Amino acid sequence: MATFSQKPTEVVKKWVIIDAENLVLGRLAAFVANRLRGKHKATFTPHVDDGDNVIVINADKISLTGKKYTDKKYYWHTGYIGGIKKRTARQILEGRFPERVVEKAVERMIPRGPLGRRQLKNLRVYAGSQHPHAAQQPEALDVGALNRKNKRIA
């Protein structure tokens, strides 16, 4: 029996929507990364973009465990000498673009390279509950119901 290898023309992509309200960030990001890569499918092929299109809503209501809300730091460099900058997760979540916390968590769980960048383009994250993808008829997934540790009630 030969190993199955899916061709890019055989890929069938679905649209799924996940409500991130009160979900633990890392657990949500791991679930979304697996969906984007297509690892949940029996037809998974490592070199083919086989994942689904994922919409995450209510990203501003994400939950972080422990003291990560105040202590977790996101670093970046401006390109100038001594230009290292940082912001805490709290500053980002209370700032203009709170969805970036979820985007960064998922981005760092996907392999770096051309295929990873293509798979990451299938992720859409929105801070509120509104999204412009109703025409795609996304299937709702309840990540909180999969495991009791996925949801944080505090």
From Swiss-Prot:
Domain of life the protein comes from: Bacteria
GO MF term (any one): structural constituent of ribosome
A GO CC term assigned to this protein in UniProt: cytosolic large ribosomal subunit
A Pfam family per the record: Ribosomal_L13
GO annotation, biological process: negative regulation of translation; translation
InterPro entries the record matches: Ribosomal_uL13, Ribosomal_uL13_bac-type, Ribosomal_uL13_sf
Oligomeric form and interacting partners: Part of the 50S ribosomal subunit.
PANTHER family recorded: LARGE RIBOSOMAL SUBUNIT PROTEIN UL13M, RIBOSOMAL PROTEIN L13
Family: Belongs to the universal ribosomal protein uL13 family.
Alphabetized NCBIfam families for the sequence: rplM_bact
Protein name: Large ribosomal subunit protein uL13
Originating organism: Bartonella henselae (strain ATCC 49882 / DSM 28221 / CCUG 30454 / Houston 1) (Rochalimaea henselae)
Originating gene: rplM
